[in-house]
Each structure stands twice: as structure tokens, then as C-alpha cells.
Curated annotation (Swiss-Prot):
Pfam families: YidD (PF01809)
Listed name of the protein: Putative membrane protein insertion efficiency factor
Organism from which the protein derives: Rhodococcus opacus (strain B4)
Family: Belongs to the UPF0161 family.
Cellular component aspect of the GO annotation: plasma membrane
InterPro entries noted in UniProt: Membr_insert_effic_factor_YidD
Protein location: Cell membrane
Keyword annotations: Cell membrane, Membrane
Membrane topology field: Peripheral membrane protein
Paired cysteines (S-S): none
Amino acid sequence: MKSALHESRADTAEGTSSASSAWKSVRALPARTLIFFIELYRTYVSPLRMPTCRFMPTCSEYAVESLRTHGTIKGLLLTVVRLAKCAPWHPGGWDPVPARHDRHAGSRRCCPANVDEQRST
């Protein structure tokens, strides 16, 4: 038999979970909107033009992938930098979207490994 305290904690955890997923959906909305317009471009405008992109993946593929990987702000910034490279003086070639880095990965350990070794000597 569950206690009232246990049930209220479970309800709170479920509420937090659904609120968190709702917040993620709201945060993803601008990126999804941009991806929608990029897909419109790829479907209706791009086929009418000669293929001229000098990069792999193409600039529109890069934009969609960067928005999905990094979110709206950083994805848009990466896309603008990529489009700025699209000029006759840049050779083009393979230019993938950079991998997403965990921003908290460095904060898990406060000290370099050798500090503990120095303390023991």
C-alpha cells in the first residue's frame, strides 16, 4: 500500500516530466519553423536551379542538420558562417556540422588529475 507522501511525489515527478517535455517542444519550435522553410526551398526553389553548391553536405542539408543538432541560435549561427563561405574564393569540399559538445562535461571534475598526485607527495 502506497503512502500519500509517495503518491504525491510520483505525481510531482510526472508533472515535472511533462512540463519538461512541453518546454523542450516550445524551445524546438523556432528551429522546426526554420527547417520547414528550408524544406520548402529544397522542394520548390532548388529543383528550378542548376546544382551549384560546392560543399558536401549542401548548404541546405547543413542548415537542417545544424538546427537539429545545435538548436536555433547556434544552428543559425553555424548556417550563416557556412553561407558566408559560399563564395568564389573558397574552395568548398567536405564541411560537416561540428559535433555537439556537452557543456557540463568539463565541470564534472574540478581539478586536473595531477593535483591529487601532488598532494600525496
